[in-house]
Design a protein with these regions (language model features):
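Extreme N-terminal leader/targeting segments of oxidoreductases
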Residues: 1-27, 42-46
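Core beta-strand elements of the Rossmann-like FAD/NAD(P) dinucleotide-binding domain
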Residues: 23-25, 168-178
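Conserved mid-domain beta->alpha element of the FAD-binding
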Residues: 32-47, 53, 132, 181, ...
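Residues in the short beta-alpha loop(s) of Rossmann-like NAD(P)-binding domains
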Residues: 56
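Active-site-adjacent segment of FAD-dependent monooxygenases/related oxidoreductases
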Residues: 61-139
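Conserved FAD-binding catalytic core of PHBH/FMO-like flavoproteins
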Residues: 103, 133-134, 143, 172, ...
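A conserved short coil-to-beta-strand element within the FAD-binding core of flavoproteins
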Residues: 147-161, 285-286
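Catalytic cores of secreted or luminal carbohydrate-active enzymes
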Residues: 375-390
Length: 390
């Protein structure tokens, strides 16, 4: 089965530089990842125009976010791509937890039948972004996608927002009523505002590898504590479309990311997981993670959405799904404000409600992360005692 083929999106000279025409939109969206694109589509369904700018011109490289929960799938369905995601994605609801080679626990996330969408599907982020870009084309008068448009700085006053944009053809100023910062965990806009994440940083490092192979593994989530193929650490296996499998391996806090990403170090580790099955490396990364958020998500006319506002560990699939909940909460409210049917005070409810949602995700994600990679002492003793009783 063919792997995903990365094709660059076309760069088009902005009208501001092509003929001196000044453009503006009710909403400027910075970031053409899943959250920014979903926000553009959601606003368009409410009749609100947006201009989306991104400094790249290709979908995300590597699978990145893969686990999309039932509620997020329902939101994607409302936005018009739910069926495509369901058709392509790997459906799953069962998870198994092992200690060594022994199964100690299993769970069913959606035991009853009759639902349109499953508990989860696994679908690589690049497919989600591709589907959303194609969906944006259904709103030619409402969504303007501008790739290779890099935000240098933003300013705001009581009348609107101005973004200074750099392109291959030069720089220009883009104006709007509101700006959504959907530019991810390393948000340039958040840094410009001097906003710090508050919460916990986890020093533990993990190897993440997407491998292409033929295997008869069921469509389940498998997690190991101290497996025989990776002693003293933890491991995770997920099936994805195109015969791609996600493998996460705990490395320890002192692992050198650049060394661990080298094929000569990755391949022997993967061989121990998959046995004698032949495989090809599709994507490799090494990461540590945070469970943190900024103090406020709404800063006058600049609104932070998704990873620019809050980040969690990848365990529990609360990152991309949490961002989709932000979109679902915000866009109808922003449409009412832009349309003059509500005041800015309505946006404060987004701030309060999604901070509550982020705090819940951060709490659960932090607990899961501490259980998976406990500190020596009390945390480790608790984890081992819990596993021994399972």
């Amino acid at each position: 089965m063919a792997r995903y083929q990365y094709e660059p999106f076309a760069y088009v000279t902005p009208p501001e530089l092509a003929g001196g025409t000044s453009s503006s939109a009710p909403v400027i969206i910075v970031g053409a990842g899943p959250i920014g694109l979903a926000a553009a589509v959601d606003l368009a369904t409410h009749g609100v125009a947006s201009i989306v700018v991104d400094d790249n011109n290709v979908v995300s490289v590597g699978s990145r976010a893969i686990c999309w929960a039932k509620r997020s799938l329902e939101i994607f369905d409302r936005l018009g791509i739910g069926d495509r995601m369901l058709e392509k994605g790997v459906t799953w609801k069962l998870g198994r937890v092992y200690r060594g080679d022994e199964e100690v626990y299993n769970f069913d996330l959606l035991p009853e039948d009759g639902h349109k969408f499953p508990a989860f599907i696994n679908l690589q982020q690049y497919y989600v972004e591709q589907y959303l870009v194609e969906r944006c084309a259904d709103f030619p008068g409402l969504i303007d996608l501008r790739f290779k448009n890099r935000v240098l700085s933003i300013s705001q006053d009581e009348t609107g927002v101005a973004a200074e944009i750099e392109t291959p053809d030069g720089a220009y100023t883009l104006r709007g009523d509101y700006l959504l910062a959907c530019d991810g965990a390393n948000s340039r806009i958040r840094r410009q505002f001097g906003l710090d994440f508050e919460g916990r940083h986890f020093e533990e490092r993990f190897l993440i590898a997407d491998v292409e192979m033929q295997a008869d593994f069921p469509s389940e989530r498998w997690f190991w504590f101290t497996p025989t193929f990776h002693p003293g650490q933890s491991a995770l296996l997920h099936k994805q479309p195109d015969n791609i499998y996600r493998i996460d391996l705990q490395l320890g806090p002192d692992a050198d990311p650049e060394e661990e990403k080298k094929p000569e170090n990755v391949i022997p580790r993967i061989e121990k997981v998959v046995g004698g099955r032949p495989f090809k490396l599709d994507w490799v990364s090494v990461y540590s993670f945070n469970c943190r958020r900024i103090d406020r998500f709404v800063h006058d006319r600049v609104i932070f959405v998704g990873d620019s506002a809050h980040v969690v560990s990848p365990f529990g699939a609360r990152g991309g799904n949490g961002g989709m909940h932000d979109v679902d909460n915000l866009c109808w409210k922003l449409a009412l404000v832009v349309g003059g049917e509500a005041t800015d005070e309505l946006l404060e409810s987004y701030n309060q409600e999604r901070i509550h949602g982020a705090d819940e995700n951060i709490s659960n994600s932090s607990w899961t992360s501490r259980f998976m990679s406990p500190e020596p002492g009390v945390e480790m003793a608790f984890r081992n005692a819990a596993l021994s009783l399972a």
